[in-house]
């Protein structure tokens, strides 16, 4: 009985994660169609070497979507 409760809770948590992720992706697609995506999420291709830090190079993808290129291309 305890195992079934744990399995049910895990299944519900997984379903909620899937739903939230899907809604975020749909919102991004709508924003792209409306043209507001680029306004809200402006990306730079490279930054000057003088402003490049190890942290920026390690975390060079600015956003999770593939529309943005690496921000530390010159490091």
Curated annotation (Swiss-Prot):
The keyword Secreted applies. The record marks 62 as: Key residue for binding both Kv1.2/KCNA2 and Kv1.3/KCNA3 (occludes the channel pore like a cork in a bottle). Residues 23-40 form a propeptide. Residues 43-75 form the ShKT domain. Residues 1-22 form the signal peptide. GO terms for molecular function: potassium channel regulator activity; toxin activity. The keyword Secreted applies. The record marks 47, 49, 51, 60-61, 63, 67 as: Important residue for binding Kv1.3/KCNA3. Inhibits voltage-gated potassium channels (Kv) with higher potency for Kv1.1/KCNA1 and Kv1.3/KCNA3. This is Kappa-thalatoxin-Cad2a. It comes from Cryptodendrum adhaesivum (Adhesive sea anemone). The lineage of its organism: Eukaryota, Metazoa, Cnidaria, Anthozoa, Hexacorallia.
